[in-house]
């Protein structure tokens, strides 16, 4: 196979690996933690993985405490927890 063909194959394999969702067994345990806005009163839009819908959904983070199921962007959440690309509901305030 030519070097151009090998390069194309490598590129396609890399793309496939990036786009293949993580299976539930490979997903970090913290992806299954419930949404937790924390105890502080800031108003910071964040995203959490919702295992019931297999989506990353918005919520309002208070700025302290909470848990590790808390991402600055939807893309970070999807990449870490392997969520589907469907858009979840708008951010909501989670009650403790």
Swiss-Prot record:
A Pfam match: Kunitz_BPTI
Tell me where it resides: Secreted
Per the record, the major location class is: secreted
InterPro entries in the cross-refs: Kunitz_BPTI, Kunitz_BPTI_sf, Prtase_inh_Kunz-CS, TFPI/VKTCI-like
Q: Which Gene3D superfamilies match?
A: Pancreatic trypsin inhibitor Kunitz domain
Q: Give the record's keywords alphabetically.
A: Disulfide bond, Protease inhibitor, Pyrrolidone carboxylic acid, Secreted, Serine protease inhibitor, Signal
| Lineage: superkingdom | Eukaryota
Query: Signal sequence span per UniProt?
Result: 1-24
Per the record, the coiled-coil ranges are none
Please give the SMART domains that the UniProt record associates with this protein. KU (SM00131)
- BPTI/Kunitz inhibitor domain location, by residue? 31-81
GO cellular component entries: extracellular space
Q: Give residues where Pyrrolidone carboxylic acid occurs.
A: 25
Read off the SUPFAM superfamilies from this record.
Answer: BPTI-like
Any one GO molecular function term: serine-type endopeptidase inhibitor activity
Disulfide cysteine pairs (residue numbers): 31-81, 40-64, 56-77
Describe its function. Serine protease inhibitor.
Family of the protein in this entry: Belongs to the venom Kunitz-type family.
Name the UniProt record assigns to this protein = Kunitz-type serine protease inhibitor 5
Q: Which organism is it from?
A: Daboia russelii (Russel's viper)
């Amino acid at each position: 196979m030519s070097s151009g063909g090998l390069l194309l194959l490598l590129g396609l394999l890399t793309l496939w690996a990036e786009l293949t969702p993580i299976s539930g067994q490979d997903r970090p345990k913290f992806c299954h933690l419930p949404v937790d806005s924390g105890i502080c009163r800031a108003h910071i839009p964040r995203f959490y993985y919702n295992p019931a819908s297999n989506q990353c959904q918005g919520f309002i983070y208070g700025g302290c405490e909470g848990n590790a199921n808390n991402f600055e962007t939807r893309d970070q959440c999807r990449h870490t927890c392997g969520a589907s690309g469907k858009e979840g509901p708008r951010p909501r305030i989670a009650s403790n």
